[in-house]
């Protein structure tokens, strides 16, 4: 027997894009609440995963190498900054995964990391949680194709998020990628589930700023189509053209 109130709550949770992770590329859209430094640290952690990575694999990060990659000095202040960022990642990367037991739908509430161990030698050992691993591995294998050196050039938080959205929506090395979403979905991807802006401010302060940074630092062109219901903005379709890839239409 189903509980009607419980079923309604579950349906609401399942319909919210900020809650549900159903495949690897959804993981790229899940952490809009993180700051730019935390996004860079998370991407650095993801970079340890390769096609040969094994379940329950333990990864080791050297803070000195991380700081060098970030262009920061090996000072006590920066070491502390890294540890604080790991603390934020540990506390703010909750995952909500769809489950089904004996034909009954539900949600598993879990987290991205199984553990993060910091040692006074400057080493950090971490493991992705048992239930997050398949999504992390799928993300790295099928979606994330940019290199750490490319990530290092991107400074803004929103540009980093847009870069991830691009990779999460892209099929292999396609020249053209379309990203579609409602205004609510776009705001969730960039701002998380708590903060909201007017459509005008969101366009000017978030999307425009992110797009301009990627166009400036990567060889791409971004075209945005604003979807409206009358005068009300209801969503966006973004076309990203990767000029590094050949334009096959010239041969048609």
Give the positions of each predicted feature:
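Charged, alpha-helix-forming regions
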Residues: 1-252
């Amino acid at each position: 027997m189903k509980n009607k109130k419980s079923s309604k709550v579950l349906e609401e949770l399942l319909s919210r894009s900020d809650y549900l992770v159903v495949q690897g590329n959804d993981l790229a859209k899940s952490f809009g609440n993180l700051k730019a430094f935390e996004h860079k640290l998370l991407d650095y952690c993801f970079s340890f995963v390769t096609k040969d990575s094994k379940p329950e694999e333990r990864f080791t990060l050297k803070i000195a190498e991380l700081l060098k990659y970030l262009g920061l000095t090996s000072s006590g202040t920066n070491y502390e900054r890294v540890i604080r960022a790991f603390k934020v990642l540990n506390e703010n990367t909750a995952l909500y995964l769809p489950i089904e037991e004996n034909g009954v739908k539900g949600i598993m509430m879990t987290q991205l990391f199984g553990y993060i161990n910091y040692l006074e030698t400057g080493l950090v050992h971490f493991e992705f949680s048992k239930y997050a691993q398949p999504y992390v591995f799928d993300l790295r294998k099928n979606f994330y194709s940019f290199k750490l050196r490319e990530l290092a050039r991107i400074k803004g938080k929103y540009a980093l998020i847009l870069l991830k959205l691009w990779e999460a929506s892209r099929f292999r090395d396609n020249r053209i990628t379309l990203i579609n979403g409602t205004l609510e979905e776009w705001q969730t991807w960039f701002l998380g589930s708590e903060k909201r802006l007017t459509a005008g401010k969101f366009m000017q302060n978030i999307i425009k700023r992110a797009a301009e940074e990627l166009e400036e630092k990567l060889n791409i062109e971004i075209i945005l189509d604003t979807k409206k219901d009358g005068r009300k903005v209801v969503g966006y379709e973004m076309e990203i053209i990767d000029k590094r890839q050949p334009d096959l239409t010239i041969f048609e």
